Amino acid sequence: MASYQGETLPDEILSLICQELGNDRDFGSLFKCALSSQSFADPALRTLYQLHQFSPAFEQRDDMEFKQRPGDYATKHAEHAQFFRRWTVLWRSITLSSLDDDVTYKPYCRYIKTLDFRNLSLMLEDMNFTGTIRTAFFAGRLRPFHFPKTEYKRQVVDIVATVNAIGDAVTAKTTLLEEIDGHISPGFLPRWISRSPRLETMVLWKGDALINGAGEAIAENCENFKNLTLHEWMSPNADELFAAFLTELKPDTLTYFEMISFNNIGKLSFGALGRHRKLQQLELGNLNEDAVRNLNALKGCTSIHTLKLDDNYGTVRIEELNNDVFLEVVEWLSSCTELRDLSLKKFFDGPALLSRVLHSPNVKLTRLSLEGYTVRNVNAQLFHSALADQKSLESVWLKGNGEDTTPDDLQIMVEGLCNLTNLRELALKDVSDEFTEEHIIALALSLPLLEDFWTSGGEVSADILPPLAQLKHLKNLTLYAMTQFHSNQIMEYLMSLDAVNQKGFTLSLMAADPDFDLTEDTQDMIREYIRANLDGRFDFVLWREAELSDSEDD
């Protein structure tokens, strides 16, 4: 067989090696490759900067490791300072490379696909970005990028002005740019977009960055643009401005849109979203009352695969006070034949909407989440009954008020869930507070494919463990019920699990009956068994401790 006899490997092979190291996120080896030879430097540095946003220096993800590592304070402080300096060197090299082709060894900014100005802002505002580190960052050719200001009688960096200046310089050279993230001032983004023909995604802190022609710039220059995330947009005219931006875009541009936090978008924006018939994922958080009253304006979005709607207040009664709107929303959701993942949070009429939509033969969900409803309610009963019509469901997440329920309320809920034999994930948070062990047993016997089971409840004995042991795919079991398990019963349950299929198993008893407390030695013994035999974890909290915790954060 012929073999390659040259002194160095072909460039194609070197590039493939670097690509594989990049896929493995092995930045240490890539850096060594860059230092090893001139022929290796180009593909190694290209890969390093293409993926720089995943590097430890960029994410500063080893920061806690330095603090926890054994050693004296001076050594750890020096290691931490060196690690932080790598972060500043990364951003300095990116910025310098945008000035002239010969300022840096390679034109690093030309390799970049993602510009995350959130990360740059975090670095500039970090308490370690002072003194010699700040001076070194802005030294030489970067002096024009230093915008100092006085804040509380001390000199700091004007982060907004600095980010704008660096962004203006870098985007002039980032010809491969696919994503722009960060808090960007109004007026800058259209120019940056026009320089980025490969742009696909933007993640912006405030929607105001989109004004003054960002939509037109995308329409004229960015054929691949499709994803937009906004953190907030509280301007009084946000609805009009966002609708104008969406109208500036070519029809069917967006496939993904997410509004994360507080905003004032509403009817006009919803109607403009309907122009984008390829929109597959729509997530609208913290909707105001006017927006909820105009949800029917979203009826043009019929290709939705994932829909998440969050009512900021939870007080709007559209079924009672705006029934025409309510019926239009039901009709819209029922017509979305591609809808697979549906989430409603704090909607007063959430159960009423779902009780009708779930009956639609056009809707075949795989994931469903409802948060912020009351179980003791006629519409809740209708919703729980309607669950049985969605046998394609693989994940159900329910959270609400489970107090003062009747036996019928709980029985209807359990019966509806027991029909979902394809379920892999079931989370019942607070809605199941008055579950008995019979309810938990019924679910365990009816849902053989469960992998993740989270439920609250009243007092439950070890009688629930044998049925739970029949769940051969279960990987996570979290019980916020008042469990009454002896250590030998817990061990018997754990020993019945399959060490291969249930590897990584986690058992969390988060509200154990104080009369069934386990000593620290017993807990350690159980933890060691589950670690050694299942590579898993055991959590144990007594009820009196759980009572003081906020399960809403779990």
List where the protein language model places each region.
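N-terminal adaptor/linker regions at the entrance to substrate-recognition repeat cores
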Residues: 2-318, 337-341, 537, 554
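Leucine-rich solenoid repeat modules
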Residues: 2-5, 12-20, 271, 281, ...
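Short alpha-helix boundary/capping motifs
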Residues: 30, 34, 160, 208, ...
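Short secondary-structure transition/capping segments
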Residues: 60-65, 320, 464-465, 488-490
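Structural motif corresponding to alpha-helix initiation and N-cap regions
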Residues: 98-102, 164, 186-187, 211-212, ...
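Short secondary-structure boundary micro-motifs
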Residues: 152-154, 326, 426
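Short, structured segments at the rim of ligand-binding sites
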Residues: 319-325, 478
